Amino acid sequence: MHTKINPKKVEMFNSLKEFLDGKDNIFFLDYRGLTVAKLTELRNKVENEKGELKVVKNNIMKRVLKDRHMEGLDSYLLGPTAVVTAVDEANVIAKIFYEFVKTSTLKVKGGFVLGEVYDEAKLNAYSQLPTKKEAISLFMSVLKAPMSKLARTLKALSDVKVES
């Protein structure tokens, strides 16, 4: 006996597979209680940072993850699930939904960041990291400080020599 696979489910599977193609950072959110307007607001904020948000069917998502050899994520696929993906600067995307959590019923379930499973606590810590731009700025200020100090010292030295 051969079971016929629902073409709509095959289409959803392929769509989700395409959605995850080339994405190393995947977050799972529980959107229970969010209005359509709030979910749309979150989606827009995520898209402004080059991320994507999609509401998924858990069983199909489990199959896609299995197909991609991504293990240990089934526990995040319970209840209403929205999946957020990010190509780079994943912590920027994580900051967005953690800010959103403060003012809504949104809950963070967990994620998959650069090949590693992150639980909610680890994702929260990850969201606190500086962005790439902030890290570069911080690094540049650290490099610049000794040079600024040297310049001020030389200026003070030249001022002293001019006075004498």
Swiss-Prot record:
Pfam families tied to this protein: Ribosomal_L10
UniProt keyword list: Ribonucleoprotein, Ribosomal protein, RNA-binding, rRNA-binding
Gene3D superfamilies linked to this entry: 3.30.70.1730, 6.10.250.2350
Lineage: superkingdom: Bacteria
Tagged with keyword RNA-binding: yes
Any one GO molecular-function label of the UniProt entry: large ribosomal subunit rRNA binding
GO CC annotation terms, alphabetical: large ribosomal subunit
Quaternary structure (record): Part of the ribosomal stalk of the 50S ribosomal subunit. The N-terminus interacts with L11 and the large rRNA to form the base of the stalk. The C-terminus forms an elongated spine to which L12 dimers bind in a sequential fashion forming a multimeric L10(L12)X complex.
PANTHER family with a match to the protein in the record: 39S RIBOSOMAL PROTEIN L10, MITOCHONDRIAL
Biological role stated in the UniProt entry: Forms part of the ribosomal stalk, playing a central role in the interaction of the ribosome with GTP-bound translation factors.
Family statement drawn from the similarity comment of this UniProt entry: Belongs to the universal ribosomal protein uL10 family.
Protein name: Large ribosomal subunit protein uL10
Source species: Borrelia hermsii (strain HS1 / DAH)
